[in-house]
């Protein structure tokens, strides 16, 4: 392994990336556009999100910051519960979020990939290492990240 050879190793653990044309936004936008957006299940599951611009910055830093090594959480500094994420996305898109999606809903509505991503999303992760090193996030909260990605700033 690289670490045995004395090389610096950074293991970037990436959260749910918020990108206008990919990931969960690509899957959720049509539902919200049709007025079918809503919290998933209980809505209490955590979402450790990261804006696309920020994830690019973090990978760049992982490559070039010689002081950074080991596991690094590439997530935004403020994880949110699914209920809050849903409310923010609805507000940014100017669409209602009235219909809660039952627990089997993600597989039916979002397919295997979407259901898998959302099932893995129930984690409250903090970017402690980055924050302790003074990393500056472009988007500190999910509302700002979603507004930026969806061109609603």
Region locations from a protein language model:
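Alpha-helical substrate-binding/gating segment
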Residues: 29-37, 45-79
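Mid/C-terminal beta-alpha module of Rossmann-like enzyme folds, strongest
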Residues: 58, 65-113, 147-153
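Alpha-helical membrane-targeting segments
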Residues: 27-49, 91-122
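Residue-level signal for the nucleotide or nucleotide-sugar donor/cofactor binding architecture
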Residues: 19, 47-53, 80, 125, ...
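NAD(P)-dependent short-chain dehydrogenase/reductase
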Residues: 2-11, 15-46, 52
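A secondary-structure boundary/capping signal
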Residues: 12-14, 76, 126
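C-terminal amphipathic/interface module of NAD(P)-dependent oxidoreductases
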Residues: 117-153
């Amino acid at each position: 392994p690289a670490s045995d050879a004395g090389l610096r190793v950074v293991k970037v653990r990436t959260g749910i990336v918020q990108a206008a044309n990919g990931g969960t936004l690509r899957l959720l936008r049509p539902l919200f556009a049709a007025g079918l957006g809503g919290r998933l299940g209980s809505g209490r599951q955590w979402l450790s999100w990261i804006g696309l611009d920020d994830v690019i910055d973090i990978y760049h830093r992982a490559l070039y910051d010689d002081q950074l090594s080991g596991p690094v959480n590439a997530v935004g500094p403020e994880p949110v519960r699914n209920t809050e994420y849903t409310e923010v996305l609805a507000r940014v898109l100017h669409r209602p979020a009235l219909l809660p999606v039952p627990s089997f809903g993600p597989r039916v509505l979002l397919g295997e990939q979407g259901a898998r991503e959302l099932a893995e999303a129930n984690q409250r992760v903090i970017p402690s290492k980055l924050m302790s090193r003074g990393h500056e996030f472009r988007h500190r909260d999910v509302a700002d990240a979603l507004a930026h990605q969806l061109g609603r700033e």
